[in-house]
Amino acid sequence: YNVFPLMGNHEENLLHIAVQNPYGLELLLKPRNSLSLLNKKGYVKSRFFKFIRNLPYYYQLEDSYLVHAGFNMNIEKSFTDFHAMAWIRNFSIDKKLNGRKVLFGHTPTKISKIKLQIEANSKFICLDNGCSHTYLGKDYGHLICYDLDSKMLYRQKNID
């Protein structure tokens, strides 16, 4: 399988804290059981830092875009607004997309709605089921994987 890792708001936050306030890293990572990202001195291990720092904000495929949050279609150069790609919540179809679908996350969405978007061959497919949002009910709390070739949706219930 080809996997497309993306820069998102959590990655941006981690990089920001790593550079601006490395002493805050433990506070950020401990509740997430992610202290293994840190070296003995409490800094992000260089291999992880380099990997995260070099993540792209989006991928342009033949028939779709993959992005963490979405695109700011209210500006001329939508594909240069990296803040929006990591943080935006609402965006719309625009001719700048050249008919491509947008597959994104960042906004927890009911599994039933995600399935409907896929079945309807929607131009927007949100692949965020709020893996850590199990408190929202049984329609949330899954890690989602979408196979671009087979159009199959896979999900794993949060077991933490």
Regions found by a protein language model. Give the residues of each.
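His/acidic metal-ligating clusters that form di-metal
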Residues: 41-112
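Short, function-defining helix-loop hinge/capping sites that tune catalysis or transport
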Residues: 16-19, 76, 114, 136
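Active-site flanking residues adjacent to catalytic metal/cofactor-binding acidic residues
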Residues: 7-8, 67, 105, 127
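Conserved beta-sheet core of the metallophosphoesterase superfamily
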Residues: 81-156
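A short, surface-exposed interaction/processing loop segment used at functional sites
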Residues: 158-160
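The start of beta-strands in P-loop NTPase/AAA+ ATPase cores
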Residues: 3-4, 63, 101, 123
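Catalytic metal-binding/acid-base residues of hydrolase active sites
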Residues: 9-11, 70-72, 108-109, 130-132
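Active-site neighborhood of divalent metal-dependent phosphoester bond hydrolases
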Residues: 1-62, 89-92
